[in-house]
């Protein structure tokens, strides 16, 4: 991912304020509500029958935290996203058979959640930088599929 020095600084500064557990749970929950076909990968999570059930599901929240933990690792290694996400790419491709388009969808949902949580602080320039990052992460996660 190519970010300018200013973009890297802005992304890092905002990410330092992110509550990974809260934002991760909301982002994954919204993915499952907005794109319900993604729920098939989470059948073991129990109740996903309504938006309230999804958003209140402790397994969704826990996995969302785990996902954003991995995203945090990516932010620390922006110059080597493919290497950083190689094992996760292999897992999601070979064992879980996740459609790689879902990575792009989750990235876009994450950007929406960040905008909702940070309001005016999440400027259009910061959004543009985060869009580059989530696109890079999605590409890295889809790498094993190619």
Curated annotation (Swiss-Prot):
<dbReference type="GO" id="GO:0031720">
    <property type="term" value="F:haptoglobin binding"/>
</dbReference>
<dbReference type="InterPro" id="IPR009050">
    <property type="entry name" value="Globin-like_sf"/>
</dbReference>
<keyword id="KW-0349">Heme</keyword>
<protein>
    <recommendedName>
        <fullName>Hemoglobin subunit delta</fullName>
    </recommendedName>
</protein>
<feature type="binding site" description="proximal binding residue">
    <location>
        <position position="92"/>
    </location>
    <ligand>
        <name>heme b</name>
    </ligand>
</feature>
<feature type="modified residue" description="Phosphoserine">
    <location>
        <position position="50"/>
    </location>
</feature>
<comment type="similarity">
    <text>Belongs to the globin family.</text>
</comment>
<dbReference type="InterPro" id="IPR050056">
    <property type="entry name" value="Hemoglobin_oxygen_transport"/>
</dbReference>
<feature type="domain" description="Globin">
    <location>
        <begin position="2"/>
        <end position="146"/>
    </location>
</feature>
<dbReference type="InterPro" id="IPR012292">
    <property type="entry name" value="Globin/Proto"/>
</dbReference>
<keyword id="KW-0479">Metal-binding</keyword>
<comment type="subunit">
    <text>Heterotetramer of two delta chains and two alpha chains.</text>
</comment>
<keyword id="KW-0813">Transport</keyword>
<keyword id="KW-0408">Iron</keyword>
<dbReference type="InterPro" id="IPR002337">
    <property type="entry name" value="Hemoglobin_b"/>
</dbReference>
<dbReference type="GO" id="GO:0020037">
    <property type="term" value="F:heme binding"/>
</dbReference>
<dbReference type="Pfam" id="PF00042">
    <property type="entry name" value="Globin"/>
</dbReference>
<dbReference type="GO" id="GO:0072562">
    <property type="term" value="C:blood microparticle"/>
</dbReference>
<dbReference type="GO" id="GO:0031838">
    <property type="term" value="C:haptoglobin-hemoglobin complex"/>
</dbReference>
<dbReference type="GO" id="GO:0046872">
    <property type="term" value="F:metal ion binding"/>
</dbReference>
<keyword id="KW-0561">Oxygen transport</keyword>
<dbReference type="GO" id="GO:0042744">
    <property type="term" value="P:hydrogen peroxide catabolic process"/>
</dbReference>
<dbReference type="GO" id="GO:0005833">
    <property type="term" value="C:hemoglobin complex"/>
</dbReference>
<dbReference type="GO" id="GO:0043177">
    <property type="term" value="F:organic acid binding"/>
</dbReference>
<keyword id="KW-0597">Phosphoprotein</keyword>
<dbReference type="GO" id="GO:0004601">
    <property type="term" value="F:peroxidase activity"/>
</dbReference>
<dbReference type="GO" id="GO:0031721">
    <property type="term" value="F:hemoglobin alpha binding"/>
</dbReference>
<dbReference type="InterPro" id="IPR000971">
    <property type="entry name" value="Globin"/>
</dbReference>
<dbReference type="GO" id="GO:0019825">
    <property type="term" value="F:oxygen binding"/>
</dbReference>
<feature type="binding site" description="distal binding residue">
    <location>
        <position position="63"/>
    </location>
    <ligand>
        <name>heme b</name>
    </ligand>
</feature>
<dbReference type="GO" id="GO:0005344">
    <property type="term" value="F:oxygen carrier activity"/>
</dbReference>
């Amino acid at each position: 991912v190519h970010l300018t020095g200013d973009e890297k600084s802005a992304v890092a500064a905002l990410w330092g304020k992110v509550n990974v557990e809260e934002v991760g749970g909301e982002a994954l929950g919204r993915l499952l509500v907005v794109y319900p076909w993604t729920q098939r990968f989470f059948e073991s999570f129990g109740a996903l029958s309504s938006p309230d059930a999804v958003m209140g599901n402790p397994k969704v929240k826990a996995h969302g935290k785990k996902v954003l933990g991995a995203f945090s690792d990516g932010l620390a290694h922006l110059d080597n996203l493919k290497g950083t996400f190689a094992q996760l790419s292999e897992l999601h491709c070979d064992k879980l058979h996740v459609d790689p388009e879902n990575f792009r969808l989750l990235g876009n949902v994450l950007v929406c959640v960040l905008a909702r949580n940070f309001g005016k602080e999440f400027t259009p320039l910061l959004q543009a930088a985060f869009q580059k990052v989530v696109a890079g992460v999605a590409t890295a996660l889809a790498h094993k599929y190619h």
